[in-house]
Regions:
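Conserved, well-structured core domains of diverse proteins
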Residues: 1-107, 117-121, 661, 672-674, ...
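Long, contiguous bundles of hydrophobic transmembrane helices that form the permeation core
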Residues: 2-26, 32-33, 308-425, 537-642, ...
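Core transmembrane alpha-helical segments of multi-pass membrane transporters/permeases
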Residues: 129, 133-134, 144-159, 167-171, ...
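Hydrophobic transmembrane alpha-helices that form the pore/transport pathway of multi-pass ion
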Residues: 213-281, 287, 291-294, 300, ...
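Transmembrane helical segments that form the transport core of multi-pass membrane transport proteins
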Residues: 371-482, 488-491, 623, 631-677, ...
């Protein structure tokens, strides 16, 4: 078991260095805090986008070389290696170059001098090394391959060849324009992602994470399989404001996995349930693993519309995981936990209402006031500042204790360290989006998008399902080595236009948001896909289980998540999209949103039925053990409930409403047949 634990440490996260120096630690804290202050400043007083992106990336590059060593050693050092200091200074100077010489570069666009090109090469090399340190080699290697392709285009096989670009042109395009490093991905990191990561960091530091866990356990802990069910709910709540699968697993799993084991779940299943719940946390609006902002920017949609499209799949996904946990609990005969370990439900609920308020302010500003995501995050952060400053004095006043200056200062200290933690979290995202910009820049420089379109069409023909399967496989493979955000940018940039073109060619009028969410979903699933599955390694470390078996079991639980992207790709109503009206669009992408509340409830309800039926088929269990003929009856429930329009298209049903009614009828019939034998011992239930 020690072997497993030692091995797992490599995958949970890239370790930061330890240096026994107060000056070093104070400087890191000050730099991180300064970055957060800068981001809040430009949220209220916007700078030129090129300048703000350059400064944003300079903070990230500098911190990477100060925080992350060339290779990780557990032994602490007394000082920072000289070469890392050189990397830090060179990296910061190079990345700030476009900001310092902004007007000069604007005057000589496309006619760069030697100094511009040398700095560009230096910056790209530094970024590749920063990416290797903070994320591992996968993304830098992919970027290098694209850069090689940019230059050696004429020597490539005919089907992917192009005229090639000079090294000078590549360097200028990638670093001195907004087509590469300083393109849309890092622009979203500057404008949106940082503020929402800071919001999540402040909430966590204030105590919201523990509150969500306590609330979930107070509500569900005493019921059958209570700890596992509470884990699902707590991960969903935490996932709303967390941008990382692994962070979600570690935050919630540290508390829930031991209690799941105590309730009777095996180490593997306890870890796997937390992995599935933690990974799916990235699907939950409003943050959605930070990719929601990039999706909105890529598609020219409002962030609110991206959340609208994601809400039914996210809730269907979590409710079906809750159902799977219930089925596992019934099969294993699990009990709840002693409720005396927790305070009363009402007392726990009331104790953290102030944590829910900033989330409500965020949602109100976005959905009701219809302000920008930047304004919504800024307002919510401001309210959180007040909560953190006054929550300790307020608690003491309520309990009749004396309030002193130290109680107020404690709130300011929490704010400081939350801002430091947010900056450290953002180093990975900022570097990932900068490197992903190189890939996006390569596509615009070489015309690779059209080449890929021809190549995919050659491989898959007109088979749209084959193209989707290839895309899912690509997302899973790349996601094993890339952060979710970078994986989404890479795959969507390469494949999304191809899927849209071929879908429309085959008569499927698919909105772009469906393709982008499809890619996003499978990128997330990579976090629990063996053999890498970083979230699985994190959970395995807590559960003291084998990370591969935890990953396999977690992926098995997440198979229900894997069918959802196919469902909403073909049935856009699952994304609240009525139709795609290209002749008279209601917005820039021609999307007509659903407006009938009853129809929305019907679609949501049937999505739950379809996902529950699929979950029962996976588990072989419903009210009790499923017989073969009952499984046969449940199989058609899944397509009838999730993609009724496809059933109508192929002449299997006269209309969607009839498809829904047949699905509901079959599901109810199987429930009744199961109810009649629910008290029988499992070994007495005949297979047929």
């Amino acid at each position: 078991m020690n072997e497993v634990n030692d091995n797992e440490e490599q995958f949970v996260e890239v370790k930061t260095r330890e240096i026994n120096s107060n000056f070093y630690n104070y400087f890191i804290a000050f730099a991180c805090f300064s970055w957060s202050v800068f981001q809040l400043y430009i949220a209220y007083f916007p700078l030129n986008t090129n300048i703000s992106r350059s400064i944003h990336l300079a903070f990230a590059v500098g911190l990477v070389f100060l925080l992350y060593p060339v290779t990780f050693h557990k032994k602490a050092h007394s000082s920072l290696p000289f070469y890392d200091l050189v990397f830090c200074v060179v990296g910061v100077v190079a990345v700030l170059y476009p900001a310092v010489y902004f007007y000069e570069l604007a005057d000589r666009t496309g006619d760069y001098i030697t100094q511009d090109i040398v700095i560009s090469f230096l910056a790209i090399i530094v970024l590749l090394e920063a990416g290797r340190r903070v994320m591992g080699p996968a993304l830098p290697i992919i970027c290098i391959l694209f850069l090689i392709y940019d230059h050696f285009g004429p020597y490539m096989p005919d089907i992917i060849s192009h005229q090639g670009a000079s090294l000078e042109k590549i360097a200028g395009h990638m670093f001195l324009t907004t087509e590469g490093v300083f393109g849309v991905p890092i622009g979203v990191s500057v404008s949106f992602i940082y503020l929402f990561v800071l919001f999540g960091s402040l909430l966590e530091r204030a105590g919201a994470g523990q509150y969500f866990i306590n609330l979930a356990f107070s509500l569900l802990g005493k019921y059958r399989g209570g700890p596992a069910k509470a884990s699902v709910i707590a991960s969903g709540l935490t996932g709303m404001v967390s941008g990382s699968s692994t962070a979600n697993v570690v935050t919630v799993g540290t508390f829930t996995i031991p209690l799941m084991k105590k309730a009777g779940l095996s180490r593997t299943k306890a870890g796997a349930i937390e992995v599935a719940a933690g990974v799916n946390g990235q699907l939950m609006p409003p943050i959605m693993g930070a990719a929601a902002f990039i999706i909105a920017e890529f598609l020219g949609m409002t962030y609110t519309n991206v959340m609208m499209a994601a809400v039914i799949p996210a809730f269907a996904c979590y409710l079906s995981l809750f159902f799977i946990v219930h089925l596992e609990s019934v099969k294993l005969g699990l009990k709840g936990i002693n409720q005396s370990e927790f305070h009363s439900r009402f007392k726990i609920f009331v104790s953290g209402l102030h944590y829910i308020t900033p989330i409500l302010i965020l949602l109100y500003t976005l959905l009701i006031a219809k302000e920008s995501a930047i304004a919504a995050a800024f307002n919510a952060i401001g309210f959180l500042f007040l909560i953190m400053i006054f929550q300790e004095p307020t608690k003491k006043l309520v309990s009749g204790e004396k309030v002193g200056l130290n109680d107020v200062l404690l709130g300011f200290e929490d704010i400081f360290w939350a801002m430091v933690a947010a900056a450290k979290s953002m180093t990975t995202i900022a570097i990932a989006t900068a490197l992903a910009g190189i890939i996006v820049g390569s596509i615009s420089l070489t015309g690779l998008g059209q080449v890929l379109s021809d190549l995919v069409e050659l491989l898959a023909g007109d088979n749209i399902m084959m193209i989707l399967l290839l895309t899912a496989l690509m997302s899973l493979i790349l996601g094993m080595g890339l952060p979710t955000t970078a994986n989404y940018i890479v795959v969507s940039s390469l494949v999304a236009p191809v899927i849209l073109f071929l879908a429309h060619k085959n008569g499927f009028l698919i909105p772009a948001i469906a393709v982008h969410l499809f890619v996003f979903y499978f990128g997330i699933l990579a976090d629990d896909t063996p053999p890498v599955g970083i979230a699985a390694y994190a959970a395995a470390g807590i559960a003291k289980a084998n990370p591969i078996t935890v990953g396999v079991q977690g992926f098995f639980y997440d198979l229900r998540t894997a069918i959802l992207p196919f469902a909403f790709f073909f049935n856009n109503k699952l994304m609240l999209i009525e139709s795609v009206n290209t002749s008279d669009p209601l917005d820039s992408k021609g999307i007509v949103w659903m407006s009938n509340p009853l129809e929305i409830l019907l679609v949501f309800g049937m999505a739950i039925v379809g996902m529950f039926a699929f979950s029962s088929l996976l588990q072989g269990y419903y009210v009790t053990k499923l017989r073969i003929w009952e499984r046969v009856l449940l199989i058609p429930v899944v397509p009838l409930a999730l993609v009724p329009n496809i059933c109508v298209k192929f002449g299997l049903m006269p209309n969607e409403f009839v498809a829904y009614m047949v699905a509901a009828g079959l599901y109810a019939f199987v429930f009744m047949t199961q109810w009649g034998i629910k008290d029988k011992p499992l070994d007495q239930i005949r297979a047929i």
